[in-house]
Design a protein with these regions (language model features):
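Non-catalytic scaffold segments within catalytic domains of secreted glycoside hydrolases
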Residues: 2-49, 55, 59-61, 73-385
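Juxtamembrane transmembrane-helix termini
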Residues: 69-71
Length: 385
């Protein structure tokens, strides 16, 4: 496999879509790991009690755009009735601190009274999206950004193929993917009825799935699995499964979630960081750009422990290469930007910029990551001048 970048004679791309190129993503999953046991990351990270301080801390680090989540399960506890007391303080605090938010409407969670497999799920989600958009318009929010459903592909696999979290199903991933696409499209249309100028960041993992050199017969299967990562975006764009209602104008901004372990050999063998088969990020970005010609955001990226600073350096260098090729990368968002007790195994998340809060509500800054962040912010500002 060639790792050489494609020839591109276009001028360097100058990002301008968001308030800041470097951004922060708050942990805001509300998945049920087991039936009846919901893990609310906005709560467990302390973010719900520290909104003002957290947004101010991002502003201090020049992270003026952030991804954060509306907790649908709290807002619509009673079918058709919306209680905004968990959400309005977020809107107000972000406005005071001048932080631009990309709002997630469903991050692996939904109200207990809904059955995700039923048509009513899509209908409720559409009404919720419309109500949320109307609330934000009433609050005077201009040029809003939304993510209707976070990581459709990952949720479909984790929730309906391997039963890792809700809806706790097996071998129904494609069915859930189609349902989540229906819900996303319904939300996009509902929000646009209120906010024609709204923009949508549609997130999913960006991965490389390759055949192992010792197993050349697996190449067609690896290639097929690699291509499957694009299926949800293709559905949203109406390129496949047209009966779902997708269209090209619904595929807006691609949100790419990218981590060190996003490379593996078919079917599930991890690929080491120094494996020669590993395709650099800028090549994966070029492939995505060639396929969709849409603006892209590295919507989540980060590494654990001492690797977090060099990882950001590597990501930034790859994104710089992509920008030089004329590829529309609009930002890099650090995840998690604040620490939380990890939802998969009850560890503390080891990769944040800001640690768990002390009794006074203060979070320690990870100095080496902050230094690399500041260095890259200066470099990218100079490049974009």
């Amino acid at each position: 496999m060639s790792h050489q970048p494609p020839t591109d004679t276009r001028q360097r791309y100058h990002p301008s879509l968001f308030r800041s190129f470097f951004q922060g993503s708050f942990p805001c999953s509300t998945a049920c790991r087991t039936p009846g046991k919901r893990l609310d990351m906005v709560f467990s990270s302390g973010h719900d009690m520290l909104l003002e301080k957290d947004y101010a801390a991002l502003a201090e680090q020049h992270l003026l755009t952030a991804r954060d989540g509306a907790r649908w399960h709290l807002i619509e506890k009673i079918p058709g009735q919306y209680d905004w007391q968990s959400f309005l303080p977020m809107v107000e605090a972000a406005r005071r601190q001048e932080i631009e938010i990309i709002w997630e409407l469903a991050h692996f969670g939904y109200p207990d009274h809904l059955n995700i497999w039923k048509a009513e799920f899509v209908e409720h989600f559409s009404r919720f999206a419309r109500a949320m958009a109307q609330l934000m318009r009433d609050e005077g929010i201009e040029r809003p950004f939304f993510t209707p459903v976070n990581q459709i592909s990952f949720w479909s696999w984790a929730g309906a193929d391997v039963a890792w979290f809700n809806p706790h199903a097996a071998n129904r991933g494609k069915e859930l993917k189609r349902q989540l696409v229906r819900a996303s499209l319904a939300a996009i249309h509902a929000i646009r009825d209120v906010y024609p100028e709204a923009r949508f960041v549609l997130t999913d993992p960006l991965v490389q799935i390759a055949h192992h050199p010792d197993n050349p017969d697996s190449k067609p299967y690896a290639d097929a699995q690699h291509q499957a990562q694009f299926e949800a975006w293709d559905m949203l764009a109406g390129r496949v499964d047209k009966e779902l209602g997708g269209s090209e104008d619904c595929l807006d901004i691609l949100g790419l979630n990218y981590y060190p372990d996003n490379h593996w050999f078919f079917p599930d063998q991890p690929m080491s960081l120094d494996d020669p088969a590993r395709v650099p990020l800028h090549i994966l970005l070029a492939q995505c750009w060639q396929r969709y010609q849409r603006p892209m955001l590295i919507a989540e990226t980060g590494a654990e422990g001492d690797a977090r600073a060099p990882w950001l350096q590597e990501i930034s260098e790859n994104v710089a290469v992509a920008l030089d090729q004329g590829i529309a990368i609009e930002g890099i968002s650090l995840y998690p930007v604040v620490e939380y007790p990890a939802w998969a195994d009850d560890r503390r998340s080891p990769g944040p910029l800001l640690g768990l809060a002390d009794p006074n509500g203060n979070r320690n800054l990870h100095e080496s990551l902050a230094l690399v962040l500041r260095s890259q912010q200066i470099k990218f500002a100079t490049r974009n001048a």
